[in-house]
Amino acid sequence: MDSFLPILNAIDSFLWGVPLITLLVGTGILLTIRLSLIQVVHLPRALGLILRAKNKGAGDISSFKALCVALAATIGTGNIVGVATAVKVGGPGAIFWMWMAAFFGMATKYAEGLLAVKYRTTDEHGEIAGGPMYYIRRGMGEKYRPLAGFFAVATVLVAFFGIGTFPQVNAIVDSVELSFGVSRVVTDIALTVLIAAITIGGLRSIAEVAARIIPFMAVLYIVICVGIILMHIGEIPAALALILDSAFTGTAAAGGFAGSTVMMAMQNGIARGVFSNESGLGSAPIAAAAAKTKEPAEQGLISMTGTFIDTIIICSMTGLVLVLTGAWHGDTAGAAMTGAAFTSLYGSIGGMLLTVSLALFAFTTILGWNYYGERAVLYLAGVRAILPYRLVFIALIACGAFLKLEAIWVLADIVNGLMAIPNLIALIALSGIVVHETRHYLEKVRRGAWMRR
């Protein structure tokens, strides 16, 4: 398969170049305008709903747990390795464009969450089933059934061969071996047993674990980064100025940094931002559909906070640490670059802290994508296919530490991009429904506030 690598790389570069990025950002801009800057005006309400949502109505898990499952899949190696790669190639200006992708992506994520709840249904066991394949088919009509099926097939392929397995497994075993000297085989066996024990229990088991790990790992990583930022607090204005200046003028070569143009900063920042927060890819609404709620718009608001937490907070922390410590123009790249920034304050312990963060991020990503793939299999083949899917997924985790097939990873990137296309078509086609539901919900909120006066 590696003989096809040049062809696959060319397709990957084209797909994740101007066409898809334009469609992703364009959809976010369209929804931002039609929803009257919902990600700004109603962000405080959205953040408040995370912990005080009513959790009444149809659904399998609470709104908070649904958000944690989505964040489990979203917060991954991209928050560490992806940001470092974007800054290494595109310069500090890539961070600004990452923010822009997240800003417009919040409106996209809101629409995904709303539609997921509005068009969800129940499976043969009475459990909730929802996501893009359902709002494409039920919202756009039966004639778009092939588009829904295409999305579901792409989701299964990404869960099996892309984000959900090999890259995450390799990130865990590599980092644990490097920092703690634990054999890859031992780590892989332990990881496989853990994943099997959790995923065999289905959504409720995954949601329970995610609800415990996600807050802990997010706070841990933020605290580590804040420690470094505080040590350079006087340099923050200069760092922000560098980020803004580089976003519009490019960055000259410095040290191990080869220099970048405005287009390089824009393309890498937006692409890595989208990879990290998954706004528009259609993955998060699969989890959102399972939330206990009567209000589609309310779950949309909660879903929107996922992009805010993932990119505006966590990715920004990584980016600021890289710029403030000067690690971005060193000779390292990827996780090693972030590791250099961590060790600048914490010494050798910094490398261990990074390993723990990376392992937790990758572990929860596996859990989240296991669920996404399972829901896609359910749509394609029904309940009878779920157990075989889980067994294959666990087998791939067991093999993941020993497979380094670059062509498969590039193919997974391509399929990941192809996931987004039917989802974005649906978001644009159903944007009128999103606007109508939003106005109806906000009117009820205003009436409720008026009646309480």
Question: What are these language model-derived features?
Answer:
Residues 27, 31-32, 104-126, 133, ...:
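Helix-loop-helix module between adjacent transmembrane segments
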